Amino acid sequence: MSSLAFNYIVNLLSHREYSEFELRNKMQEKNFSEEEIDEALSRCQAKNWQSDRRFSENYLNSRAQKGYGVGRIRQELRQLKGVSSDIIDEVLMESEIDWYEMAENLLRKKFPNYNEQQTPKMKQKIWQYMLSHGFRSDEFADLIGQNQSEWD
């Protein structure tokens, strides 16, 4: 095994967590062979220095703190980070995040003056904002109908 490949991965992992997909891409950019990549990754995973599950848990918590919902986080993990759907599903099921409460807090923060007499245009703007942040309509639709006194 190439100690250069192994040392490269260890150096990357010493700074932050990476998904296996991200590490593979970085190593391919440095022109390591597939064999070197596989061996170095296997060694790091055997030592539990790299784990897609742990990466996903950390990523979920980080993105949730920034106000993103399940849909957006799931999409990013799958498409951008290359994490398997099985791992994503497990991590989301074990998460103790209250997505409804998060949607409510995000709505209050972004639209503090909202009340149910708002124009349809404003309701559409809120709807689009929440969907773009990865919340399902059932997580925020009834919040749009709440009156201002419930937000205070």
UniProtKB/Swiss-Prot annotation:
Keyword Cytoplasm recorded: yes
Protein origin, superkingdom: Bacteria
Pfam assignment, any one: RecX_HTH3
An annotated GO cellular component: cytoplasm
Biological process per Gene Ontology, one example term: regulation of DNA repair
Alphabetical keyword list: Cytoplasm
Locations listed in the record: Cytoplasm
UniProt similarity note: Belongs to the RecX family.
Primary role: Modulates RecA activity.
Stored HAMAP family: RecX
Descriptive protein name: Regulatory protein RecX
Species of provenance: Haemophilus influenzae (strain PittGG)
Lineage: Bacteria, Pseudomonadati, Pseudomonadota, Gammaproteobacteria, Pasteurellales
